[in-house]
């Protein structure tokens, strides 16, 4: 299977994330998909702290154990929260822009890779 990574010209979410990091402002991302209803995501929500997350989301992070894989990590907010808890987390994304933001924000192990890349063969205890 050939793995797919995004190019900057086809990465509106990555562009919004890196723009928000650089300028501290962005409006909403409109998400269109044949797999679910149209949605709007306020970009600042992608930069929330653990304390700003809903209680269900906080609980999900607290229940993560062992070696954790954060798939589609975006800006790295979950990876950063897990790191603050002292947990071992690898954050992956197919967006080079998002991976750059994760590096700038201090995510310890951000990687530009597709989950379905046949060369990605590590094992994890928790997948988020």
PLM regions: where:
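N-terminal auxiliary segments of SAM/dcSAM-dependent transferases
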Residues: 1-32
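Conserved alpha-helix/loop element of class I SAM-dependent methyltransferases that forms part
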Residues: 47-67
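Conserved SAM/SAH-binding loop
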Residues: 75
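Conserved SAM/SAH-binding beta-strand->alpha-helix loop
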Residues: 95-96
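Short alpha-helix immediately C-terminal to the canonical SAM-binding loop
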Residues: 99-100
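Conserved SAM-binding strand-loop segment of SAM-dependent methyltransferases
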Residues: 106-117
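A short acidic, Gly/Pro-enriched loop at the edge of an enzyme's catalytic core
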Residues: 118-127
